[in-house]
């Protein structure tokens, strides 16, 4: 029997799309954090974001992942609003 080239745990289309949403959110959060003027605050928030995503990396339940994405988007919007107010 020939060995399969697919990895043993191939993602379904739904899982793949959800993973892309999570990665996009992570990148957006890190880009927003780069706009923070204070080095110490920027470092703190970068560490916080990394730890939150690492902590939730093993989540597999669809509803839980959707809820975390929604919360992450709300936190991103709040950060963007705060940065906009700080610049004005």
Curated annotation (Swiss-Prot):
GO biological process, one term: mitochondrial respiratory chain complex I assembly
Compartments, record wording: Mitochondrion
Family membership noted in the UniProt record: Belongs to the complex I LYR family.
Transit peptide boundaries: 1-19
PANTHER family: LYR MOTIF-CONTAINING PROTEIN 2 (PTHR13675:SF3)
Keyword Mitochondrion: yes
Protein name as catalogued: LYR motif-containing protein 2
InterPro entries for the chain: Complex1_LYR_dom (IPR008011), Complex1_LYR_LYRM2 (IPR045293)
Organism of origin: Rattus norvegicus (Rat)
Pfam families xrefs: Complex1_LYR (PF05347)
Highest taxon of source: Eukaryota
Function per UniProt: Involved in efficient integration of the N-module into mitochondrial respiratory chain complex I.
GO CC, any one term: mitochondrion
């Amino acid at each position: 029997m020939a060995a399969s080239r697919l990895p043993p745990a191939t993602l379904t289309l739904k899982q793949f799309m959800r993973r892309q949403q999570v990665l996009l959110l992570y990148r957006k959060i890190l880009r927003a954090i780069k706009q923070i003027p204070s080095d110490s605050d920027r470092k703190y928030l970068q560490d916080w974001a990394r730890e939150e995503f690492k902590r939730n990396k093993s989540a597999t339940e669809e509803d839980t992942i959707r809820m975390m994405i929604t919360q992450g988007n709300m936190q991103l919007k709040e950060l963007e609003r705060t940065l906009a107010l700080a610049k004005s």
